[in-house]
């Protein structure tokens, strides 16, 4: 069973297109869990208009925090495989099938994406190249985050290990990515499986660099490492890897 987890807030402009691109790739027993953080536009009306029993909407934390909203939606996910999704992208038709193939060998898969404008015109053909993504887990932990949430799919064991989120992390994807990298197995794949839409209301990364100071980034990364080292994600799990 697959759980697609979406955190929404005032996403009426693009949520319909995104849901349509996702639902046609899922089986009847899969689910789309949506945590809505108090949208005041037509987001919920559009979602309800699909009348699809695979869609389940839960109330978000009402704090307008993507990290808290994603934590909430993950708590409700029942699937053996978890796919994270932003509310404004579009999935390529082979995203689920491609990721599922790799998830038979690895616990977490991070796919590439093409970066587009709001009309899906390609701005950058490769998100990995735009963000200078490294596949080295030490580099990702200590220097620059290589994990983009909407590109991530992982097994239930990664979800269970990552929850609950520590309170002192900058963003949900850097935490989940490092949990997966240091306790399970991660695979970066070059397949561009998402149209990663950039527009004025975008919350996620845009390739322009971090909004945090270097000192803040160092503190955030220390918090990530500290939470892993103190075994927050399970007894002896830092020393254990699935063979």
Please provide the spans of the model-predicted regions.
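Short aromatic/hydrophobic "clamp" motif used to bind/position activated sugar donors
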Residues: 82
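Short, well-formed alpha-helical segments that are part of the catalytic scaffolds
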Residues: 11-24
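Conserved donor NDP-sugar-binding/catalytic core segment of glycosyltransferases
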Residues: 96-123
């Amino acid at each position: 069973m697959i759980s697609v987890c979406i955190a929404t807030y005032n996403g009426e402009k693009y949520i319909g297109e995104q849901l349509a691109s996702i639902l046609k790739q899922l089986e009847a027993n899969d689910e789309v869990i949506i945590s809505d953080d108090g949208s005041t536009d037509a987001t919920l009306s559009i979602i309800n208009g699909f009348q699809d029993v695979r869609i389940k909407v839960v109330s978000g934390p009402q704090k307008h925090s993507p990290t808290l909203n994603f934590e909430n939606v993950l708590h409700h996910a029942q699937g053996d495989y978890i796919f994270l999704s932003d509310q404004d992208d579009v999935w390529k038709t082979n995203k689920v099938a491609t990721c599922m193939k790799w998830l038979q060998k690895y616990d977490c898969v991070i796919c590439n994406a093409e970066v587009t404008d709001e009309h899906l015109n390609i701005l950058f053909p490769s998100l990995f190249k735009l963000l200078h993504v490294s596949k080295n887990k030490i580099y990702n932990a200590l220097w620059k985050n290589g994990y983009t949430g909407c590109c991530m799919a992982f097994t239930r064991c990664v979800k269970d290990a990552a929850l609950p989120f520590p309170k002192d992390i900058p963003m949900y994807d850097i935490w989940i990515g490092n949990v997966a990298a240091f306790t399970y197995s991660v695979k970066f794949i070059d397949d561009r499986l998402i149209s990663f839409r950039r527009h004025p209301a975008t919350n996620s990364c845009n390739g322009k660099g971090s909004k945090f100071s270097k000192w803040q980034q160092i503190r955030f990364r220390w918090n990530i490492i500290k939470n892993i080292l103190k075994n927050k994600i399970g007894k002896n799990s830092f020393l254990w890897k699935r063979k």
